[in-house]
Design a protein with these regions (language model features):
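Active-site beta->alpha N-cap acidic-glycine motif
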Residues: 55-149, 153, 157-164, 171-173, ...
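Short low-complexity, flexible loop/linker segments enriched in glycine and/or proline
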Residues: 126-128, 152-154, 214-216, 272-277
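Active-site-proximal beta-strand/loop segments in catalytic clefts of secreted hydrolases
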Residues: 87-89, 113-117, 140-141, 177-181, ...
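N-terminal pre-catalytic segment of deacetylase/amide-hydrolase enzymes
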Residues: 2-86, 92-105, 216, 248-250, ...
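Catalytic grooves of carbohydrate-active enzymes
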Residues: 225-262
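Alpha-helical scaffold elements lining the catalytic groove of polysaccharide deacetylases
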Residues: 93-98, 144-171, 182-227, 240-243
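Residue-level detector of anion-binding/catalytic polar loops
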Residues: 109, 135, 197, 204, ...
């Protein structure tokens, strides 16, 4: 019969092994899917920013455990003061004309992430967005929960959307934003391998919440502005007609320059750090 002696060294080794096993189990539960928006059925436009802090924390734990997670671009490391206004469009278009007129008034460009069914319903608006120099990204064809899709289903969503977009403006997209802000490794890897950059945001107006006043939105957004920031708004945001002009005027007054996502992203070889910041690789 073999006799095992529990020395201090053995106990430490066993404890480390147990800790790694527990951490792996926790990560499997916490990090497998990142769901960051409320149910679309209850909100006119979802809020994908609710748990960004938890996502980053989970990502750092995954790196520690050797289970590194993929991240989209939340912001860009820039020495200049370029920032990007992004507008998700999936419901209605009654405020889109106001948004475009406001952007024209201040001579700035934005990036619109459209859903395929929205683009099909409002092709003239899509044409105007493109004609006025704004960038258009892929927000999927049907606004599904991407974490629940297979790689092929993800690719089908991307292709169906771009087929719709191309039929309207003769162009396909190179940027992608996930519905509900949801993503996992498979979503990001599949989308990037298909030739898109995955774009999130570091500043959320949360303008889909009807109870948020324009003042509340501005007081939340403006102090967070920094070079390379990506702002999330919605084309049908409740208070967008009240807050957007002030947001733009204030940012311009602070020396910021609004550009499209394509102009904001860095050229050359880049990395995305644990906070989702795109940086030069060297």
């Amino acid at each position: 019969m073999k006799v095992f002696v529990l020395t201090k060294k053995n106990l430490i080794a066993a404890g480390l092994i147990l800790a790694v096993i527990i951490l792996a189990v926790v990560l499997a539960i916490v990090c497998s899917d990142r769901s960051t928006e409320p149910n679309v059925g209850t909100d006119p436009s979802p809020d994908p920013n609710a748990q960004i802090g938890n996502e980053v924390e989970s990502y750092e734990l995954a790196v520690f455990a050797g289970l590194q997670k993929e991240l989209p671009v939340y912001s860009v490391s820039r020495e200049d003061k370029k920032i990007a206004l992004t507008i998700d469009a999936a419901w209605a278009d009654d405020k889109t004309e106001f948004i475009l007129e406001t952007l024209n008034k201040y001579n700035i460009k934005a990036t619109f992430f459209l859903c395929g069914f929205w683009a099909e319903k409002y092709p003239d608006i899509v044409k105007r967005i493109d004609a006025e120099g704004h960038q258009i990204g892929n927000h999927t064809a049907t606004h599904p929960h991407m974490n629940k899709l297979s790689s092929q289903q993800i690719l089908d969503e991307l292709k169906k959307y771009d087929d719709i977009l191309e039929s309207i403006i003769g162009k396909r997209s190179t940027l992608f934003r996930a519905p509900y802000g949801e993503y996992n490794d498979n979503v990001i890897t599949t989308v990037r391998n298909a030739g898109y950059e995955v774009i999130q945001w570091d500043i959320d107006t949360v303008d889909w919440r009807e109870e948020r006043s324009a003042e509340t939105i501005l007081n939340s957004v403006l102090p967070k502005l920094k070079p390379g920031s990506i702002i999330l708004s919605h084309n049908n945001g409740f208070k967008i007609e009240q807050y957007l002009p002030t947001l733009i005027e204030t940012a311009l007054g602070q020396g910021y320059e609004f550009v499209t996502i394509g102009e904001l992203l860095l050229d050359g070889t880049t990395i995305i750090d644990v906070n989702g910041v795109q940086k030069p690789a060297n």
